[in-house]
Structure formats: C-alpha cells, structure tokens
C-alpha cells in the first residue's frame, strides 16, 4: 500500500520538538500555563519538559491544532526555528497532557554541560550517508540498548546504556582510549530526534574532544529526508509514545510494548511461549513476583473491558 493511501486513516499528527535556549523561571511558569491551556482547548495530548536549558516535548492531536501549538510555542520562546519533526498516528498516541518543569530537558546529570553555549557541528540528513561510510569517522548511537535493538545504522558503536546518564561513563572508559589511539577520527553521533546527540556533543566538547558532529534532527529527520532506496537505516525507530516504533515512512511500525517491563516487543516476540499479554514477555519472564503478575493481570482485565465497551477508544491497547 502506498504511503498516501496509508495516510488516509491517520488522523492524528505527532510533533517531536526541542530547543536548547536559556529560559528564566518566570518564563517557564508562563510557558507551562499557556501551553497547558492551549492543549486542553485543542484536545492535544503529550509530554513537555521545560528547564533553564530549554524545552523538549512530543505532542499528538489534530493537524491544525498541532500547527497552532508549535506556532504558539515559538512565539513564547521568541524563536522561529524550533527543531521539530512530524509523524502520524491512527489513534491518540498519549493518554494525557503533561507540562513539567525539570532540571534538564534531557538528563545527563552533569551541571557543567550547557548546550545553549556550545555543541558540535550539524550534519544534514542528506550528508549522513557520506559520513557513515567515511573510513576516518566513528559513529555513536547515543540511545538506549532497547532502542538500538529494534533499529540502527550498521557499524555505529552501541554504548549499551539503559539511560542517557550512563553515557559519560562509557565515553571515559571506551571513547577516550579509542580517540587517543586514533586522534584523526571524526566523531559523529545520532539519536531519535536530535536532542540526546546534541547534548552529547556538548559533553564531548567540554571533555576536550574535537571534530565532533551530530545528525541534525536525528533519525526522524533522516527518515523524512532520505528515500528508502538510498537509506542506510535498518529496522524501525523506537519512539516514546503509544505507537512504540515507526517505519521508514514515519508511520506506526510493527512493534508493541510489554506493559509489564516497558520494553518493545516484535511480532516474533509475540509468538513466543513466554509471552502473555499484559503480564510478561521473553525479556521479563523471570523478573517479577507472583504478586506483581496478579496486579498486571487485573490491569489487563480492566483494559480489555474498556476495549470491549469502547471499541473506538483512541488509546492504543495494552500488549
């Protein structure tokens, strides 16, 4: 089925955005209040994080409402170029709207890192293949292990982290020795939408690394700009909402989420004897107590009842 035909059933637009920009506390409170009011009026759901270093969020709603929301956010931030990527969803991708004030909009846990002052060099999506194939470059995936497992660029280093907080330790243990032995290597990093790899470049620059680059707009921008025929991307892209993953056309992929452990599960995982809907998957079969599983079973029973009564429910069902 062609993308245009598939899009006919996708009535919700999803916007993933971020901007590293200095914001004072009074402005944060105002922005939070205005965006919450707009989201309520326009039936927009999602999550937005606000901090002194900027804004980071993903929202879902009717297309016109999403456009208005982004325009309002840019006015509130006094910018005209917020980093935003769009994709589509058949159903509402979030359960509620939340706007929160945080210490960081993406948590690396180091106070001295300030992406509003210094970051690496952007690589456009159309130039990323050339960088990947450059023998004098090293490419690093700054996402978590469970994200990398379902999709990646072949040859990229996998730090095998379970959270972004672990990235600095990996740099000290693995990347520093590599660059000390190969000082001419160019460093390139990527992530889902650009925010983690951008902050990672700020950290590397602070640590004295040079020739540091990152994929502008992340994987999502690459999938938007680079055709599947020319793409070096393998698999699907994990996203932090009810869709779980996106295919190369930025439409919902084939993965579901295990609502016991929160990890993505593939169509093959669903067929394994260890999989029980809502209770366990192959990755967490030995991780929970009988008491935990009883709670999971009751939650799944309630979800199933809701789905029976409200078959047109816009929220994705549990897996």
Swiss-Prot record:
Query: Which InterPro entries does its entry note?
Result: Rhodanese-like_dom, Rhodanese-like_dom_sf, TrhO, TRHO_N
For whether the record's keyword set contains Transport, the answer is no
Homology family: Belongs to the TrhO family.
The name on file for this protein is tRNA uridine(34) hydroxylase
What Pfam family does this protein match (any one)?
A: UPF0176_N
Lineage: superkingdom: Bacteria
Among NCBIfam families, the record links this protein to: PRK00142.1-4
Q: Where is the active site?
A: 191
Sample GO molecular function, one term: oxidoreductase activity, acting on paired donors, with incorporation or reduction of molecular oxygen
Assigned keywords, A-Z: Oxidoreductase, tRNA processing
Rhodanese domain ranges (all copies): 133-231
The role this protein plays is:
Catalyzes oxygen-dependent 5-hydroxyuridine (ho5U) modification at position 34 in tRNAs.
The protein's matches in Gene3D superfamilies, at most eight in alphabetical order, are given as: 3.30.70.100, Rhodanese-like domain
Supply the EC number(s): 1.14.-.-
Name the enzyme's class. oxidoreductase
- Protein's GO biological process: tRNA modification
Catalysis performed (reactions): uridine(34) in tRNA + AH2 + O2 = 5-hydroxyuridine(34) in tRNA + A + H2O
């Amino acid at each position: 089925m062609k993308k245009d035909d598939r899009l006919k059933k996708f009535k919700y637009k999803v916007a993933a955005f971020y901007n590293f920009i200095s914001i004072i506390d009074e402005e944060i409170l105002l922005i939070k209040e205005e965006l919450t009011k707009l989201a309520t009026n326009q039936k927009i759901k999602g999550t937005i994080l606000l901090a002194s270093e900027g804004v980071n969020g993903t929202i879902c709603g009717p297309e016109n409402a999403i456009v208005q929301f982004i325009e309002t956010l840019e006015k509130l931030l006094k910018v005209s170029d917020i980093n935003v990527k769009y994709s589509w969803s058949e159903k509402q991708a979030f359960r509620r709207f939340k706007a929160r004030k945080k210490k960081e909009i993406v948590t690396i846990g180091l106070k001295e890192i300030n992406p509003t002052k210094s970051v690496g060099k952007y690589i456009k999506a159309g130039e990323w293949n050339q960088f990947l194939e450059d023998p004098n470059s090293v490419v690093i995936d700054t996402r978590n292990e469970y994200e990398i497992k379902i999709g990646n660029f072949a040859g990229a280093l996998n730090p095998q982290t379970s959270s972004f907080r672990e990235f600095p330790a990996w740099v000290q243990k693995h990347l520093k020795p590599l660059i000390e032995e190969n000082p001419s290597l160019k460093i390139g990093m990527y992530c889902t939408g650009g925010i983690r790899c951008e902050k990672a470049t700020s950290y590397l620059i602070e640590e004295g690394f040079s020739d540091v680059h990152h994929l502008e707009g992340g994987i999502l921008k690459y999938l938007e700009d680079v055709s599947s025929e020319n793409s070096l991307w393998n698999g699907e892209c994990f996203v932090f909402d009810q869709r779980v993953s996106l295919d190369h056309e930025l439409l919902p992929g084939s993965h579901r989420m295990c609502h016991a452990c929160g990890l993505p599960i593939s169509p093959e995982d669903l067929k394994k004897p260890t999989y029980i809907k809502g209770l366990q998957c192959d990755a967490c079969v030995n991780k929970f107590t009988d008491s935990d599983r009883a709670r999971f079973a009751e939650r799944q029973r309630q979800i199933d009842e809701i789905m029976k009564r409200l078959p047109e429910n816009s929220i994705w069902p549990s897996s």
